[in-house]
């Protein structure tokens, strides 16, 4: 009884803050991107484990090396070219700019550009993982690395820019939920071609 009375007294004297500062929004949005990126990275690691289970025992180490190398190559290429290619699309356009990305975000943008880059990089790696699983034991490692670089620097950023970068799909009212079309459609089409 005493606890209920004290809870009523305390709650009547306290006021909840209804708005959050720009800095608080920046921190929480950036943290959300980082957490989401880590979860997508675990998904890509799961693809590696699935792929390792689907191949013969002698190919498991090659599959693991292919997935680690894919992460390194995709991250570097997406940083150098892919991010600006995806987000540099003019409104209703098709292709962004071929420039090296620099983070120009501040508290007014609502999130850190690096957190968004990390999140999107994990999606690039997941897209390449779809292809990796489809061509397991049917492609040598170096041609796959070349393909992963092309996928991270050209193919995926262009299709990503059509929606998330404000391109022609976004202008047409297309709605994509968490990459269900962009990531899996692009990865599936590339896997089918492979």
Residue ranges and their predicted role:
Residues 1-194:
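Hydrophobic alpha-helical transmembrane bundles of multi-pass membrane proteins
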């Amino acid at each position: 009884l005493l606890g209920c009375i004290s809870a009523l007294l305390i709650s009547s004297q306290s006021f909840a803050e209804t708005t959050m500062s720009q800095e608080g929004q920046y921190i929480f949005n950036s943290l959300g991107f980082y957490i989401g990126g880590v979860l997508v990275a675990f998904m890509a690691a799961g693809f590696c484990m699935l792929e390792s289970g689907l191949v013969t025992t002698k190919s498991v180490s090659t599959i693991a090396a292919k997935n680690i190398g894919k992460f390194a190559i995709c991250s570097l290429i997406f940083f150098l070219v892919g991010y600006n290619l995806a987000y540099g699309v003019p409104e209703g356009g098709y292709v962004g700019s071929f420039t090296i990305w620099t983070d120009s975000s501040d508290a007014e943008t609502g999130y850190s550009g690096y957190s968004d880059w990390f999140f999107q990089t994990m999606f690039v790696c997941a897209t390449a993982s779809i292809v990796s699983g489809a061509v397991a034991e049917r492609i040598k490692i170096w041609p796959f690395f070349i393909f992963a670089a092309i996928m991270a620097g050209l193919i995926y950023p262009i299709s990503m820019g059509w929606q998330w970068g404000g391109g022609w799909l976004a202008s047409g009212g297309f709605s994509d939920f968490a990459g269900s079309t962009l990531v899996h459609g692009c990865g599936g089409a590339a896997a089918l071609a492979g």
